[in-house]
Amino acid sequence: KGFVAKQDYASAENSLKQAIAQSQDDILTSLAALRLSAVQFQQGQFDAALASLNQVKSQGFSARKDLLAGDIQVAKGDVNGAKASFENAQKSGNPLEKQMAQMKLNNL
């Protein structure tokens, strides 16, 4: 978080990749992968950001994963992919995530 706050995205990316490589815990790995994907998205590395989301294994993060994937796909111009991701988030998310997914679907 500190590197992102300082807009040192390269250091943030390296730290998160290291955390993913060293973690034996699916929840920690999933959280680090979500943050890594967000950092890569921030830098315009859309394909890398989508690839990082493949490391999210914990089911508890599936809606957050789908919401972020949808945002990345929108930025890439993949409206159909974004729609599918947001619809998946609606199926697996908590009430707030479902509402957010619906808002994003409405904005497509």
Residue map of PLM features:
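TPR/TPR-like (Sel1-like) alpha-helical repeat modules
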Residues: K57-Q59, Q73-L96, N106
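Alpha-helical adaptor scaffolds
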Residues: K1-A63, A69-I72
